[in-house]
Every structure is written in C-alpha cells, then in structure tokens.
C-alpha cells in the first residue's frame, strides 16, 4: 500500500532551555530544541520531538534536504495532517 505525505513548515530555535512545540505563527509551526545546530543535532531533536508528539516512529518523519536555516520543511504521513490542523485551529499545542 502506498503511503501519502504532506509537507509541514517549521521554524526551529536551537539551544533553547527545553524541547517544546511552541505553536503556530501563521502557517509555520515554531519548535524549540535544546541541541546546538551542529552536525544535524538540532534536526534530530526536531524529528524526535515531532515523532513523540504525533505518536510516530522517527523513521516516518523526513527532513527535506537542503534546509540549513532555521526554517525547515518536514515530510509527514498524510494521516498526521488532521492532528496538526487541530493544533493550528486551537492556536497552541499543549501536549508536551
């Protein structure tokens, strides 16, 4: 069976005090991670945080290559789109 995907845009703040999903700023999900932006450490922390929040294995979350800035594009299974839309509608994320 073929899995469908969608793209989530995120803005990452590395070297934060805690790993957390802050909420939406327009269409962009703001995420804070404790890791430094070196050797992919912050990217891995973003993937781990989203995996936990969406109850997915990390292997189902893909960072689209080429993004070295704070703005990232994440490829997610289509089944997660309604969950993230709910976060956007509520104006916050209170799960973590």
Curated annotation (Swiss-Prot):
Matches recorded under SUPFAM superfamilies: YggU-like (SSF69786)
Pfam (any one): DUF167
Cellular component terms (Gene Ontology): cytoplasm
Cysteine-cysteine disulfides: none
Signal peptide: none
UniProt superkingdom: Bacteria
HAMAP family named in the record: UPF0235
Family: Belongs to the UPF0235 family.
Protein name (Swiss-Prot/TrEMBL): UPF0235 protein CAB243
Species per Swiss-Prot/TrEMBL record: Chlamydia abortus (strain DSM 27085 / S26/3) (Chlamydophila abortus)
């Amino acid at each position: 069976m073929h899995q469908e995907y969608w793209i989530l845009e995120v803005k990452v703040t590395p070297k934060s005090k805690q790993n957390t999903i802050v909420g939406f700023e327009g269409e962009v999900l703001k995420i804070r991670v404790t890791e430094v932006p070196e050797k992919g450490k912050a990217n891995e922390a973003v993937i781990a945080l989203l995996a936990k929040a969406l109850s997915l294995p990390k292997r189902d979350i893909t960072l689209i290559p080429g993004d070295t800035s704070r703005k990232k594009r994440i490829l997610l299974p289509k089944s997660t789109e309604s969950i993230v839309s709910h976060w956007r509608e509520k104006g916050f994320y209170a799960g973590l």
